[in-house]
């Protein structure tokens, strides 16, 4: 039975390029999940967009001496160019700079305000007398009071993931000039998170299918007690407050950006000429998944659900399969600290499926994982080239050369051959279960294990020897290996769409796997075949030294 799946994916700040940490953390797992569900025949809407507001953009604009709008648009266009290179299959990708988004965010604000979930309060905020202005969140840096990380910001600690405010930081300073700010009174609007504490605890305690790290982090945070949080800032860049007399204030980006999932859904529906079509993806009969990095967990498991509870009539998240951090040399990738491997740079030298494979096999699902160029080369050469790619190349080349470029007759199969076919069908069932439960590393491991089993079968049968004495026996062995390849093209498709599409074509099925379903299709005897090209290219060992040198390591 088909399902309806909504996939919301973290909105990247439009202040720098995409790096591998972003891809492994949110965008690749979301794309894998979307492709899998489409192949199953489910209704899928996967949305995201560029976060054009917030202090990361204004900080960069000030550094470059241009407007925040210019910075945001530059990187939004770069993101738009990067997604196809990565094979990210958005149903809709937009930005927070649209009139539709501003309207949707303001409607959410007014709804919560009118229901008493947003209120005004006078608070002390950091003010830099040297720069003569209030300092919103990321304009203040200091030491985290919880984990003592010295690079924490006035909105959050990237090291331990806890949301903060500037007053909590130790040894705080203005990011712009380095001087310690003073605190002055200013009026802001607050989201009454405390009103949702008990309801959120009851709701989260039902989420036993969540990843352990996400569930434990959320429950621990909730049971410490929720504090009301300011949702406005003294800025001139962002979504204006929809109330008179507050022209100098904007909606705080953490409140505004999560509303993007809703505004993007509405914009998608309008683009289809069906302005109400978004509603079915926000009803109770839809499963909503939010793919994010671990620094965004509380915003998606606590704050966004609280906003949805307050608004009413909108579906709460079913799952928030947050990943941990991808590191390099045990350091977190960071745009703001310029410690990263940039996506466009990597893809200018290596195939997209090679990158997607390593990031999938090494995905930081339950703990931080380290990106290594040595591992990148090893997995490409040993697993993609020597195992999976070699299986496809030698089977299809032998078939095309010896059976007139057609799928051969195979006759009666022996027990060993039937066992491999059964294992292929079982692998598809097992990967289906793993993917359904967002266990991506397990799914790709199962697929590669089947490729290894198919190679063992081929080595046992040795059709290159059989063909010299019994062409019919060789045909049986090669046909069974083609069945295994047919299963592998499906299992690998969510992870490696480019090579899976080519393999599918070489097997005579065509390249549109999503239309076929998550099933094992048997190659059709007599089907014309195209001689294959290698699915993957071997990398030289020198790549390790070259790439580490580029990183300055």
Curated annotation (Swiss-Prot):
The keyword ATP-binding applies. A motif ('HIGH' region) lies at residues 12-22. One of its GO terms (biological process) is methionyl-tRNA aminoacylation. The keyword Transport does not apply. Its main location: cytoplasm. Binds 1 zinc ion per subunit. Its cofactor is Zn(2+). Keywords: Aminoacyl-tRNA synthetase, ATP-binding, Cytoplasm, Ligase, Metal-binding, Nucleotide-binding, Protein biosynthesis, Zinc. It is found in: Cytoplasm. ATP binds at residue 335. One of its GO terms (cellular component) is cytosol. Monomer. Belongs to the class-I aminoacyl-tRNA synthetase family. MetG type 1 subfamily. This is Methionine--tRNA ligase. It comes from Dehalococcoides mccartyi (strain ATCC BAA-2100 / JCM 16839 / KCTC 5957 / BAV1).
């Amino acid at each position: 039975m088909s399902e309806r799946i909504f996939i919301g994916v973290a909105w990247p700040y439009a202040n720098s390029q995409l790096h591998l940490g972003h891809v492994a953390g949110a965008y690749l797992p979301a794309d894998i999940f979307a492709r899998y569900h489409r192949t199953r025949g489910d209704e899928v809407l996967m949305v995201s967009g560029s976060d054009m507001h917030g202090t990361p953009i204004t900080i960069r604009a000030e550094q470059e001496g241009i407007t925040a709008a210019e910075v945001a648009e530059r990187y939004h266009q770069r993101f738009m160019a990067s997604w196809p290179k990565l094979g990210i299959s958005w149903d809709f990708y937009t930005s927070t700079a649209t009139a539709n988004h501003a309207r949707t965010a303001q409607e959410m604000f007014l709804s919560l305000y009118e229901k008493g979930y947003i209120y005004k309060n006078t608070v002390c905020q950091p003010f830099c007398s040297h720069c003569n202005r209030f300092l919103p969140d990321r304009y203040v840096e200091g030491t985290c009071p919880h984990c003592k990380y010295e690079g924490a910001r006035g909105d959050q600690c990237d090291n331990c993931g806890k949301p903060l405010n500037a007053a909590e930081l130790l040894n705080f300073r203005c990011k712009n000039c380095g001087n310690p700010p003073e605190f002055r009174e200013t009026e802001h609007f607050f989201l009454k998170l405390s009103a949702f504490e008990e309801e959120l605890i009851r709701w989260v305690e039902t989420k036993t299918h969540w990843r352990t790290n996400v569930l434990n982090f959320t429950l621990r945070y909730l049971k410490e007690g929720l504090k009301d949080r300011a949702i406005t800032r003294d800025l001139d860049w962002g979504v204006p407050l929809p109330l008179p007399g507050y022209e100098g204030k904007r909606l705080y980006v953490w409140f505004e950006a999560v509303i993007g999932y809703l505004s993007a859904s509405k914009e998608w529906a309008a683009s289809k000429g069906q302005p109400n079509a978004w509603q079915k993806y926000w009803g109770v009969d839809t499963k909503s998944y939010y793919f994010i990095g671990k620094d965004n967990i509380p915003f998606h498991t606590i704050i966004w659900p609280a906003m949805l509870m307050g608004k009413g009539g909108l579906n709460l998240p079913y799952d928030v399969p947050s990943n941990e951090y991808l590191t390099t040399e045990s350091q977190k990738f960071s745009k703001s600290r310029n410690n990263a491997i940039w996506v466009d740079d990597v893809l200018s030298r290596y195939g997209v499926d090679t990158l997607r494979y390593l990031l999938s096999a090494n995905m930081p699902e339950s703990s931080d994982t380290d990106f290594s160029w040595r591992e990148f080369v090893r997995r490409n050469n040993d697993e993609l080239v020597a195992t999976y790619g070699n299986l496809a190349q030698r089977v299809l080349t032998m078939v095309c050369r010896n059976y007139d470029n057609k799928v051969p007759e195979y006759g009666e199969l022996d027990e060993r051959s039937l066992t491999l076919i059964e294992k292929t069908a079982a692998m598809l069932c097992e990967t289906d279960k793993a993917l359904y439960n967002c266990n991506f590393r397990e799914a790709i491991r199962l697929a590669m294990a089947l490729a290894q089993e198919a190679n063992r079968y081929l080595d046992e049968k040795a059709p290159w020897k059989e063909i010299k004495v019994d062409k019919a026996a060789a045909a049986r062995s090669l046909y069974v290996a083609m069945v295994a390849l047919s299963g592998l093209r499906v299992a690998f498709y969510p992870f490696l769409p480019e090579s899976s599409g080519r393999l599918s074509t070489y097997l005579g099925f065509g390249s549109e796997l999503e239309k076929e379903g998550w099933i094992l299709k048997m190659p059709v005897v007599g089907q014309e075949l195209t001689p294959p090209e290698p699915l993957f290219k071997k990398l030289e060992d020198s790549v390790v030294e070259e790439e580490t040198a580029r990183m300055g390591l």
